[in-house]
Amino acid sequence: MEPELEHTLPGTLTWSHSGGPESQEMDFLEQGENSWPSPAVATSSERTCAIRGVKASRWTRQEAVEEAEPPGLGEGAQSRPAAESTRQEATFPKATPLAQAVPLAEAETSPTGWDLLLPDCAASAGGSSTGDLELTIEFPAPEAWDCELEGLGKDRPRPGPSPQAPLLGLSWDDELQKPGAQVYMHFMQEHTCYDAMATSSKLVIFDTTLEIKKAFFAMVANGVRAAPLWDSKKQSFVGMLTITDFILVLHRYYRSPLVQIYEIEEHKIETWREIYLQGCFKPLVSISPNDSLFEAVYALIKNRIHRLPVLDPVSGTVLYILTHKRLLKFLHIFGALLPRPSFLCRTIQDLGIGTFRDLAVVLETAPVLTALDIFVDRRVSALPVVNESGQVVGLYSRFDVIHLAAQQTYNHLDMSVGEALRQRTLCLEGVLSCQPHESLGEVIDRIAREQVHRLVLVDETQHLLGVVSLSDILQALVLSPAGIDALSA
């Protein structure tokens, strides 16, 4: 008998939302009113502000927040239950404890010392409210997705011209020394992964005895890009099945003349992992709901993964899967309640946030197989598609590759990347981009509003200059103020 696609785990979840009115958290992805649980309520039902001594009321679209100090800035580090290790856990470096941050009420300077929003920066503050975000469902149309996965490889071809990097300023270190530059770092240290979890969401789990072909088709049918793998023999989660695995299947098939595609398709997931990925896959990296969002950001960027399972510390059950996009959206929504750092008004070119050199690109005339080679070798999640003049004409992501399975066209990897983009069910008009003169605040607002994972940095003639990704932004807002560079580690 074939195992079910959605594996039901024994046991009862120990983490659940209480039924009281103070804890009925509206999931913004499932509810039409775009409501989130207030982080102040999620971590402490009542929070006394350091300045005026008033309570912050529950925050939704229908309720206004009373004027108060931003949550998490006026008190010491919160005591939380220690996270129990259920899988491999990342080692997190020492960051500035929240208790060492100077409370606003005790500072000798006035509130203007936090570098609040200047009048000339008011335009970049637009779109910071939840009303500007199109927050609908957890899994939007697959064609609008970009892949967020990892990959492995050897040889990389060199398609496309080498883009010119903009002249970068050296002011980012100076900005981090200004008062208020650590406000987002403290916010993410103060709140836990439980705060960012949805009240209700879809979670697809595969048993390792499932055939790999059926698993990939199930991912397409359910609109997911990754699924936890359950080993019934070990009675534990052993990893994640991602689109990277599908890319590796195609890559091995095309690069090995003696291997037939149907032979790989009929393999079980456990066979694929043991034979074809021998020595390549790593133990599952997970996190506890008690751990801070700061640790979640570090684990995602440090391990170069795009899915971080939240495991129950007692039962080991997967409760939720955190992503870069979920964390930035959480920070973007509640960041409107925090003092606005001055660096949000600085331009991308001045701050140097993003990737500007040694960019992975692909020519629109190159075959899809060339794009697969770059995905495997460079471990990137998307490739800017350029023409012979170096102008950006599209964006080919890892998730576009799995469309080959949905359309039964994965035997035709010799088609051009441009043709593959035109065959997508959903044809996107243009490429979401930004320019060097735009401020960091404007870029963050656009990424959150459009629900994308990156913006392509171009000049006035649409020539490629760089890429600004979610990892770049989270590194700058959360980890850099703590003196941590997880991107280069």
Swiss-Prot record:
PANTHER family: 5'-AMP-ACTIVATED PROTEIN KINASE SUBUNIT GAMMA-3 (PTHR13780:SF31), AMP-ACTIVATED PROTEIN KINASE, GAMMA REGULATORY SUBUNIT (PTHR13780). The AMPK pseudosubstrate motif resembles the sequence around sites phosphorylated on target proteins of AMPK, except the presence of a non-phosphorylatable residue in place of Ser. In the absence of AMP this pseudosubstrate sequence may bind to the active site groove on the alpha subunit (PRKAA1 or PRKAA2), preventing phosphorylation by the upstream activating kinase STK11/LKB1. ATP 2 binds at residues 225, 307, 325, 397-400, 424, 432, 453-454. ATP 1 binds at residues 225, 240-245, 285, 306-307. It comes from Mus musculus. AMP/ATP-binding subunit of AMP-activated protein kinase (AMPK), an energy sensor protein kinase that plays a key role in regulating cellular energy metabolism. In response to reduction of intracellular ATP levels, AMPK activates energy-producing pathways and inhibits energy-consuming processes: inhibits protein, carbohydrate and lipid biosynthesis, as well as cell growth and proliferation. AMPK acts via direct phosphorylation of metabolic enzymes, and by longer-term effects via phosphorylation of transcription regulators. Residues 1-95 are annotated as: Disordered. Residues 32-47 have a biased composition (Polar residues). This is 5'-AMP-activated protein kinase subunit gamma-3. Gene3D superfamilies: CBS-domain. AMPK is a heterotrimer of an alpha catalytic subunit (PRKAA1 or PRKAA2), a beta (PRKAB1 or PRKAB2) and a gamma non-catalytic subunits (PRKAG1, PRKAG2 or PRKAG3). Interacts with FNIP1 and FNIP2. It comes from the Eukaryota. AMP 3 binds at residues 306, 355, 360, 381-382, 453, 469-472. InterPro entries: AMPK_gamma/SDS23_families, CBS_dom, CBS_dom_sf. Residues 197-258, 280-340, 355-415, 427-486 form the CBS domain. A motif (AMPK pseudosubstrate) lies at residues 293-314. AMP 1 binds at residues 240-245, 285, 306-307. GO terms for cellular component: cytosol; nucleoplasm; nucleotide-activated protein kinase complex. One of its GO terms (molecular function) is ATP binding. The lineage of its organism: Eukaryota, Metazoa, Chordata, Craniata, Vertebrata. One of its GO terms (biological process) is regulation of glycolytic process.
